[in-house]
């Protein structure tokens, strides 16, 4: 409804891959010249069956349920904001694309190329993730690099001939200390070795160990430097004769608040003031599809959904009293984009 031309792309998984939901793109032509890309995701982090265990519920001004703020609220905000403008007879927005992808929570590996293609045709990107708990919208996000290091040594009996062994766990320990030591080297850059698993028995020198590492940076330059530092630690061995394989498990470029993003944030603040509420923009360490649009050079603004919190957790909530103000905010923003 609402005049949207809808395109639906079916995911064809490779062998061993999970089947993702459809990628759905709605397009609406207005009389304005600006091309606006709105992005929301249809997937959540929760396992099948979670809704049966914890169905949608409300308590006063709060709604609870899996994905209620991340990000069913934002998805609907996009549609309702356009409905509000249509009901008001406003037809001066330009070409509007509402992009609904099914794989954001795993880093948008399938939809990213299509996001980049759409971003290449857009003057602005509005990402509909939930607003922060304090109501802030999001103008910058850290870039994220996930790396898996697979370390292989040589097994040996720890009591009989330990000298023949080459401990993958010892090498992993050295690398863990070196990686964690990168924290504080650059402003805002964090490195976390979040998963370690290796070895088989206490009396065997460990042949294998795996590290999973999370690297985050607020700026493109330090993101690249941190990536090179991780690579150097990967390639520098303390234990002789070990081999290390580095596998990239996904990445997002930083969403930096450039001139275009700052203009969008200022416009949103102005619209909110006219609607009668204060609005601030903030930086956050988590990534979203706004990292992709911003990295492609498109002025981007995020956190435009309703207020919510405890994303990914059992008490995930949405502030119902924020729904109408945030729909109004997005509608106002869409109606003013011709002016920037």
Describe the residue ranges of each PLM region:
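Metal-dependent amide/peptide-bond hydrolase catalytic core
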Residues: 130-131, 139, 146-340
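Short Gly/Pro-enriched turn/cap motifs at secondary-structure boundaries
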Residues: 13-17, 137-141, 281-283
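Short beta-strand segments
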Residues: 39-40, 99-101, 126-129, 150-152, ...
